[in-house]
From Swiss-Prot:
Free-text comment on this protein's domains from its UniProt entry: AB domain, comprising of helices A and B, is involved in structural stabilization, protecting the hydrophobic core of the protein. It is required for high-affinity binding of Ca(2+) and for Mg(2+)-binding.
GO molecular function: calcium ion binding
Sequence ranges assigned to domain EF-hand in this UniProt record: 39-74, 78-110
Gene (UniProt): PVALB
Modification N-acetylserine occurs at: 2
Annotated family: Belongs to the parvalbumin family.
Protein name, entry field: Parvalbumin alpha
Upper classification of the organism: Eukaryota, Metazoa, Chordata, Craniata, Vertebrata
Annotated residues for binding of Ca(2+) 1: 52, 54, 56, 58, 60, 63
């Protein structure tokens, strides 16, 4: 399954373009722009599993840096600052990684 099976390709392209500048990434705006906020809980979980590249059941900090590439292969990597900000927002239990429920909460709070 690919991201465009779940989200509109044009919305993804616009959202990735909107955050092309380093240190401009805002996960709340990004999730809204790609249409993730409007998706069912099931679809949000499917997106999580696409982003969980190593299939560990968590998005670790190293995977988080590549989150935009999970939506579009030609997107940029997040900066260290953006990655840490996103991890702080999503890692509710402080274990250094984002689980599927934490990701769902992160999207819902967007």
């Amino acid at each position: 399954m690919s991201m465009t099976d779940l989200l509109n390709a044009e919305d993804i392209k616009k959202a990735v373009g909107a955050f092309s500048a380093i240190d401009s990434f805002d996960h709340k705006k990004f999730f809204q722009m790609v249409g993730l906020k409007k998706k069912s809980a099931d679809d949000v979980k499917k997106v999580f599993h696409i982003l969980d590249k190593d299939k560990s059941g968590f998005i670790e900090e190293d995977e988080l840096g590549f989150i935009l590439k999970g939506f579009s292969p030609d997107a940029r990597d997040l900066s260290a600052k953006e990655t840490k900000t996103l991890m702080a927002a999503g890692d509710k239990d402080g274990d250094g990684k984002i689980g599927v429920d934490e990701f769902s909460t992160l999207v819902a709070e967007s």
